Amino acid sequence: LLFGNGGNGGNGGLLIGNSGDGGAAGNGAGISQNGPASGFGGNGGHAGTTGLIGNGGNGGAGGAGGDVSADFGGVGFGGQGGNGGAGGLLYGNGGAGGNGGAAGSPGSVTAFGGNGGSGGSGGNGGNALIGNAGAGGSAGAGGNGASAGTAGGSGGDGGKGGNGGSVGLIGNGGNGGNGGAGSLFNGAPGFGGPGGSGGASLLGPPGLAGTNGADG
């Protein structure tokens, strides 16, 4: 209760202890025939909380969206990354945000190729009072649009990078996560996702903003 580290996603001790990391998410199931959408990637788990002294855990990664290997089926979007845990109320580092999952891609068997799914966003970095804040997670890439036929699919958009955590007193602000790349295409290109913002710090250097993802 007072001392000790949390397990995955668990809380640290009320006085001293590190919180656990968030669990990684499962991937969406792909399908191999025409029809319904494939599975979406699950969202990564958030880290647990810390007490007075301890480091925040890292957020879990988002799962990848499922692919489709035949026409007219939807595709799974990438899951969101979990948020990093905050550092202790007195001292401790914030955890990093989890990375977003990549999107699935559609089939391209006949003339009407499907569109790529969107990449998952990165989780936000944990905040800190005295200590370094966590970095935001990087976003997942968009899925590729189908390339076959006269009406190729559009590329999926990249996800947004997570924001870096902020520091209330002394320490480095967290860096923002990178935006996901837009996908390849035969129709319209996918747009790259924006990078996350860098975290502020009262008596320390701020974090750097993440880079924007490249367009398809």
Question: Where would I find each of the regions flagged by the language model?
Answer:
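Collagen triple-helix signature
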Residues: 3-216
